């Protein structure tokens, strides 16, 4: 189902700045207005490992005009089997800086801001204030919950993705439209990230995340509000589960004006 968006006049100067030859294959789906929305949007990609690396590449290639890339880590040899923005010459460099350089080559018109810092609640708040959409490329739940809380306060959509081995999941959360990310968080959000992954898994999951972001920015398609896409690539199969928010402690706490994740999760 296509979400109805408010009609807006075409900005002729903005169209002239677009290289429509680059985006000709997607204009039939998004239209010129949709492409202009992408070019005027800002997306924060948090975590530039397997998921965030590919998500950033697809977003830049699709014509998103401004990207914020957040990751404190440096490139390691074990990243190179799936994190295609890096090469052997990037080992030891900050992921955010190396990715920004590569994306600048892919889309010279885009504004790309590398942030080689660790995510904390204050940075999550800054990202939620600045970005139109936040894309989760993280590998730990506590950091995801910081993003969830900040995006909820700011009323910004957060696209969540996770991948391990040959499995993954994707959903979109937004205040007033869906349950929150805490509804599907594990009981121990400080659980370590995955250590076993194969490149095609992050390719599939990151593609679904980018599609969610494009839906949100253009109004084309139906985001996964209150639904969780569960991906099993051993079969392969994608099952979409309905999410309920009947007794989510975080949702109830927010409705009552509380935001204490530490007390909610015992961390």
Describe these PLM feature segments.
Residues 37, 126-127:
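Structural alpha-helical scaffold elements that stabilize or flank donor/cofactor-binding regions
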Residues 55-56, 99:
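Hydrophobic residues within alpha-helices
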Residues 6-11, 64-107:
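Glycine-rich phosphate-binding loop and adjoining beta1-alpha1-beta2 segment
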Residues 35, 56-57, 148:
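Generic hydrophobic/aromatic pocket-lining and core-packing "Φ" positions
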Residues 51:
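Hydrophobic/small residue at the entry helix of a nucleotide-binding pocket
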């Amino acid at each position: 189902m296509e979400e109805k968006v408010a009609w807006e006049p075409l900005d002729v100067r903005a169209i002239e700045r677009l290289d429509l030859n680059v985006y000709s294959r997607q204009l039939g789906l998004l239209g010129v207005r949709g492409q202009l929305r992408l070019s005027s949007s800002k997306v924060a990609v948090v975590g530039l490992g397997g998921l965030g690396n590919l998500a950033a590449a697809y977003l830049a290639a699709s014509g998103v005009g401004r990207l914020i890339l957040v990751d404190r880590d440096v490139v390691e040899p074990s990243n190179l089997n799936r994190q295609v923005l890096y090469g052997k010459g990037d080992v030891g460099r900050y992921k955010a800086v190396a990715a920004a350089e590569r994306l600048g080559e892919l889309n010279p018109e885009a504004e790309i801001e590398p942030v080689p810092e660790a995510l904390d609640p204050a940075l999550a708040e800054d990202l939620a204030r600045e970005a139109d959409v936040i894309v989760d490329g993280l590998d730990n739940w506590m950091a995801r919950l910081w993003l969830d809380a900040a995006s909820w306060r700011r009323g910004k959509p957060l696209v969540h993705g996770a991948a391990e081995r040959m499995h993954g999941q994707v959903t979109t959360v937004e205040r007033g439209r869906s349950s929150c990310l805490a509804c599907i968080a594990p009981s121990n959000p400080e659980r370590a990230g995955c250590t076993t992954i194969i490149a095609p898994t992050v390719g599939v999951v990151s593609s679904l995340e980018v599609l969610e972001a494009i839906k949100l920015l253009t109004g084309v398609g139906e985001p996964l509000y209150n639904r969780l896409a569960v991906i099993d690539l051993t079969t392969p199969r994608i099952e979409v589960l309905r999410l309920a928010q009947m007794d989510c402690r975080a949702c109830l706490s927010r409705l009552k004006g509380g935001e204490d994740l530490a007390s909610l999760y015992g961390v």
